[in-house]
């Protein structure tokens, strides 16, 4: 996405305002290996760059922290889908093995599910209006 909402400062600010710590997946002096990311410090938003150019220097510098994915052999980088999968697998495994309360509250799950349903159904506004008018009769 190339709109103004994609500017690094706006993205990082919105994530922080929503209560997330931002962690760039990039080599930075303070970067930690994926398996050492502190999950006790609260909700985290991982930042991934494009396969060609990675994260912008502004995003890397502006993130609250950074992590790197350990690689072995002759590999210098993973493509984006592999990087995301490796991070999600490791962090999910660690969260499930921890005492951290990481699941979404029931109300938040319902909101996300309803949002997904609305985005999945054609003419959802018309269907909701019809349903509402029929209930009011």
Per-region residue spans from a language model:
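Post-transcriptional modification and biogenesis factors for structured RNAs
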Residues: 1-137
């Amino acid at each position: 996405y190339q709109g103004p909402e994609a500017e690094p400062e706006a993205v990082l600010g919105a994530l922080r305002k929503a209560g997330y710590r931002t962690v760039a997946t990039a080599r930075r002096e303070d970067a930690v290996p994926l398996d050492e990311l502190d999950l006790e410090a609260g909700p985290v938003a991982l930042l991934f760059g494009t396969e060609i150019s990675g994260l912008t220097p502004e995003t890397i510098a502006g993130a609250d922290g950074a992590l790197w994915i350990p690689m072995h052999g002759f590999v210098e980088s993973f493509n984006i889908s592999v990087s995301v999968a490796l991070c999600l697998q490791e962090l999910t495994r660690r969260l499930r093995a921890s005492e951290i309360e990481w699941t979404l509250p029931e109300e938040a799950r319902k909101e996300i599910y309803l949002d997904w349903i609305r985005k999945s159904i054609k003419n959802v506004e018309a269907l909701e209006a019809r349903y509402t008018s029929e209930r009011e009769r």
